[in-house]
Amino acid sequence: MAEVGEIIEGCRLPVLRRNQDNEDEWPLAEILSVKDISGRKLFYVHYIDFNKRLDEWVTHERLDLKKIQFPKKEAKTPTKNGLPGSRPGSPEREVPASAQASGKTLPIPVQITLRFNLPKEREAIPGGEPDQPLSSSSCLQPNHRSTKRKVEVVSPATPVPSETAPASVFPQNGAARRAVAAQPGRKRKSNCLGTDEDSQDSSDGIPSAPRMTGSLVSDRSHDDIVTRMKNIECIELGRHRLKPWYFSPYPQELTTLPVLYLCEFCLKYGRSLKCLQRHLTKCDLRHPPGNEIYRKGTISFFEIDGRKNKSYSQNLCLLAKCFLDHKTLYYDTDPFLFYVMTEYDCKGFHIVGYFSKEKESTEDYNVACILTLPPYQRRGYGKLLIEFSYELSKVEGKTGTPEKPLSDLGLLSYRSYWSQTILEILMGLKSESGERPQITINEISEITSIKKEDVISTLQYLNLINYYKGQYILTLSEDIVDGHERAMLKRLLRIDSKCLHFTPKDWSKRGKW
């Protein structure tokens, strides 16, 4: 068995922790750092295959020294493009690299879409030609069993979901059914390349390079051991004390403090409670700077220009970085607008969360970063932020999508919002003149301001799309309908467009913003 003094950075061994059920478990963890406080060693551990927000300092009593794995000495590897080659490349990038090295030419798909493996009984149905309309006596029964969704490359000759083809609605067994027409009489390909998760981030399955602009941008570099470790112990913000999840580039001298004190109105940071109290006697703000563009009840939204209110915007980014791992901080906030959601009481407007967006986005992004502060999570505020971002897009007359990559919690929130919003549209369709109502993907996108790609990926994620006799059929089972109705009953916070006072600006005509 190894001794405590032999433990170094890079070692792996089981570490005792409590799980969600308050039970002891021994997951494998990596030692990222070692420090000595008053003669007692502390070890900063990252639990393998766990989110980094669970990383923590532990004592040697929680380490299983019998199963320690010492780091292997790595052979020196040549650098690629002038960058150190100590960290293995991501699988997505290694595949094309290996293919090029072998001299093979990779096929470039013209289009990528999602397909479903349908049961054989659905594919071969007696009676009727492919061009005939589907009737309620067809085989479109509610599909109660779980089927795996698959991604496949589609050649130009293979039909893909049409964005303008109308969707028909007809009832069966008390549940609504939608049928989206497409090119008839073509067979589907069956080769599978991945899962529907890929459709959220990019159309070709290969992550794009991060944009090096803006206040918070994609972070793909985790080589620096310093940025892999939480550096702030605790933050006091108003009546809340927050435990940061990730590294944030606050000044080095603040990282040794037991508590970092923030003014909840201007977000300036101080070393002590005395500093905060002195600041509060001088701070005139009782709400975020900028214009209040929405108020309903106790909820307000403030629009803040990253150029006009640079200090506040930078402090907001520093605070947000404590809870966002997939982004890295930049101090150029000029190209961004910040929308801060607050909750009002007799003391002022308290920050709940925020999202930022580019003043000019060539990729139709309506959100760059989005965050609900931990004390307000799981209360419906996340969806309210998302709904507000799309409400702004509606006023601007645009469709929008969040900047990728999304965090794990962000992806869950967006999928939930997209699903509820699209199902709300589909279930609200009414028939006219006795005919089945029809709708296209383009129309759904225009009504909701959700980008067409997100509409399609959501329908695929919900497993609503089936291909039958040359048509793409949207099938809403009773389980889907019941689940949606239950979810909407719990969603009490909604954006009221009548309470929004917002005039979009044409930033392209304003020079340097």
From Swiss-Prot:
GO terms for biological process: apoptotic process; cellular response to estradiol stimulus; cellular response to glucose starvation; cellular response to glucose stimulus; cellular senescence; DNA damage response; DNA damage response, signal transduction by p53 class mediator; DNA repair-dependent chromatin remodeling. Changing S90A: Reduced phosphorylation, leading to reduced protein acetyltransferase activity. Abolishes phosphorylation. Reduced histone acetyltransferase activity. Abolished phosphorylation by GSK3 at S-86. A zinc finger (C2HC MYST-type) spans 260-285. The active site is at E403. Changing K120R: In K6R; abolished autoacetylation. Changing L257A: Does not affect phosphorylation. InterPro entries: Acyl_CoA_acyltransferase, Chromo-like_dom_sf, Chromo/chromo_shadow_dom, HAT_MYST-type, MYST_HAT, Tudor-knot, WH-like_DNA-bd_sf, Zf-MYST. Its main location: nucleus. Changing K187R: In K6R; abolished autoacetylation. Changing C369S: In NEDFASB; decreased histone acetyltransferase activity. Acetyl-CoA binds at I370, L371, T372, Q377, R378, R379, G380, Y381, G382, K383, S407, S416. Gene3D superfamilies: 2.30.30.140, 3.40.630.30, N-acetyl transferase-like, Winged helix-like DNA-binding domain superfamily/Winged helix DNA-binding domain. The modification Phosphoserine is found at S86, S90, S199. Residues 227-504 form the MYST-type HAT domain. Residues 69-106, 122-220 are annotated as: Disordered. It holds the Pfam family MOZ_SAS. It catalyses: L-lysyl-[histone] + acetyl-CoA = N(6)-acetyl-L-lysyl-[histone] + CoA + H(+); L-lysyl-[protein] + acetyl-CoA = N(6)-acetyl-L-lysyl-[protein] + CoA + H(+); (2E)-butenoyl-CoA + L-lysyl-[protein] = N(6)-(2E)-butenoyl-L-lysyl-[protein] + CoA + H(+); 2-hydroxyisobutanoyl-CoA + L-lysyl-[protein] = N(6)-(2-hydroxyisobutanoyl)-L-lysyl-[protein] + CoA + H(+). One of its GO terms (molecular function) is protein-lysine-acetyltransferase activity. Residues 368-513 are annotated as: Interaction with ATF2. One of its GO terms (cellular component) is chromatin. There is a cross-link at K430, K451 (Glycyl lysine isopeptide (Lys-Gly) (interchain with G-Cter in SUMO1)). It is linked to Neurodevelopmental disorder with dysmorphic facies, sleep disturbance, and brain abnormalities: A neurodevelopmental disorder characterized by severe global developmental delay, intellectual disability, poor or absent language, behavioral abnormalities, severe sleep disturbance, seizures, cerebral malformations, and craniofacial dysmorphism. Progressive cerebellar atrophy is also observed. Additional features may include genitourinary tract anomalies, hearing loss, and mild distal skeletal defects. Component of the NuA4 histone acetyltransferase complex which contains the catalytic subunit KAT5/TIP60 and the subunits EP400, TRRAP/PAF400, BRD8/SMAP, EPC1, DMAP1/DNMAP1, RUVBL1/TIP49, RUVBL2, ING3, actin, ACTL6A/BAF53A, MORF4L1/MRG15, MORF4L2/MRGX, MRGBP, YEATS4/GAS41, VPS72/YL1 and MEAF6. KAT5/TIP60, EPC1, and ING3 together constitute a minimal HAT complex termed Piccolo NuA4. The NuA4 complex interacts with MYC. Interacts with ATM. Interacts with JADE1. Interacts with PLA2G4A/CPLA2, EDNRA and HDAC7. Interacts with the cytoplasmic tail of APP and APBB1/FE65. PANTHER family: HISTONE ACETYLTRANSFERASE (PTHR10615), HISTONE ACETYLTRANSFERASE KAT5 (PTHR10615:SF219). Catalytic subunit of the NuA4 histone acetyltransferase complex, a multiprotein complex involved in transcriptional activation of select genes principally by acetylation of nucleosomal histones H2A and H4. Histone acetylation alters nucleosome-DNA interactions and promotes interaction of the modified histones with other proteins which positively regulate transcription. (Microbial infection) Catalyzes the acetylation of flavivirus NS3 protein to modulate their RNA-binding and -unwinding activities leading to facilitate viral replication. This is Histone acetyltransferase KAT5. It comes from Homo sapiens (Human). The gene is KAT5.
